[in-house]
Amino acid sequence: MKAEEQRTAMSFIDTTIKMRKEANAKKVVLAWGLLNVSLAGMIYTEMTGKMISTYYNIAYWPLWYIELALASLFSLNALFDFWRYFKYTMASPNITLSPSQQKLVGVPYSMAQSSPQPDLITNKVPVSTPSPSMQGQNVLSYSPSRSPSSSPKFLSTCISGYSPQIQAMLPNSGSPFTSVVSYSSNSFPKITSYSPSPSSPQYLSNLGPVENGGLRSRYRSSPSAYSSPTDKEDYMTDLKLLDTFLRSEEEKQHRAQLGPDASSTSTSPTFWNYSRSVGDYAHTLRKFQYQLACRSQAPSAHKDEADLGSKHAAEEVWAKVIMNRPLQDHMDAWTAKFRNWINETILVPLVYEMDSVKTQMRRLGCPDLQIGESSITSLKQAALVKAPLIPTLHIIVQYLDITPNQEYLYERLKELSHGGCMSSFRWNSGGDFKGRKWDTDLPTDSAIIMHIFCTYLDSRLPPHPKYPDGKTFTSQHFVQAPDKPDISNENVFCIHQSSINPPYYELVYQKHIYSLPKGRNNLFHTLLMFLYIIKTKESGMLGRVNLGLSGVNILWIFGDL
């Protein structure tokens, strides 16, 4: 039987391949036929007009025989091509394909007969012509207003032990579209010895049964579908077989929801009835026992120990800059927007460009010279040598010039760029590296963020003759320990990192030092105060660069002040 099916399938495939070849050949032979007819017509025109012999003044009869031979040859070729074309057209294999099959095998619609899509559900229950009281109702629903003579006879088979009291419960019981009560088998897969009383709740519908979902409503078909003439083999003729099929599908679905332990008979849906106690289901209910969640080991920006700094102290520092008290209430929103700006404007594009440069280096035959693997010195040399081929490498190297451990820096930048708002940020440490915890030989996340922020503004500020290395912003507005800013100079406006581990940042402006509380927000609040002063007291200008909408576009985080 299997060999015969394979031969049938191979024959079908061979036929479709042949049809595709003939479809392509039809176009070719038709083109050649038209070309041969055209050439034969041109030669015949020359034979009657004698243009070549007259123009070149040569003997006419030898040329006439040559032209006659060519005209005959082209005419025969044209006849042969047209005969092949009509052969492919009239004698094509007779095969019936659905539109999806025609698209799959690539057979033109004109060469195959179209057939409608087969119905996905072919097993249906034959039902005789329904009586007027059955019109518009589900065959698995129960209507209390229906008389016993009009009730379907298989209801007692589908729901064993179900004996409803047939009573006239509604005044419009004679209407063809009566209100019905539909008992869903999804909630009660098997109901035994159940007899509803007239006082039972009724779920009414004006146009048919209530759709409660489940497999029975999924496999049901409307009564109008049963009257359509189809093959007898497409029906389930045994009502018990239908009931068994529905129950088995419900049992499979229930076991799939409970998991592999539901294979025992105690968890079978046929055992869920009113005669069993709760203790019988202890094994199943144990799967859904309430348990406390385990504490996540992932780093979180909300669990730092140093985040217990006094909010009141921060408000006192901000009060020296912001005179309007309600603005201080927006500090959390400003911090979130600023973190998101760093991620979307610097981190994500930086990681993308690093991966792009790594791909370009491999294409140039330098697989050993990669970002995250080679030293910063090698990358700087490559940026000079490969500048015409990879112009962005020189820019990326500036962001990576913070630690000798390039592998850790590359992986940490990728981790920080995930999540949209630097969710893995750790202000006084960093991430794990090769299975070991972060140590002081690696830069903190605060140092990394501060470095890339300064490098980004270095690239936006115009070059300055005092700073040939291009670090204009870093040289003017960032001082790192052990160096100290000149507080006596009124023009000094910078961010001072007074401590490396743990990192601590202060703002120096007009001979004043603004020391915000330590913790995970110290870096962001210091930078926010730096930007806020630029917006409110420097007209949004950092030197000759506008940090507003027409420039760097970072001051939008404060909104309209």
Curated annotation (Swiss-Prot):
InterPro entries: Cytochrome_B561-rel (IPR019176). It is found in: Membrane; Nucleus envelope; Golgi apparatus; Cytoplasm. It is a multi-pass membrane protein. Residues 220-229 have a biased composition (Low complexity). Coiled coil: none annotated. Pfam families: CytochromB561_N. Glycans are attached at N94, N273, N343. Its main location: membrane. Keywords: Cytoplasm, Glycoprotein, Golgi apparatus, Membrane, Nucleus, Transmembrane, Transmembrane helix. The keyword Thylakoid does not apply. Disulfide bonds: none annotated. One of its GO terms (cellular component) is Golgi apparatus. The chain crosses the membrane at residues 28-48, 60-80. Residues 120-149, 191-233 are annotated as: Disordered. Residues 125-140 have a biased composition (Polar residues). This is Transmembrane protein 209. The gene is tmem209.
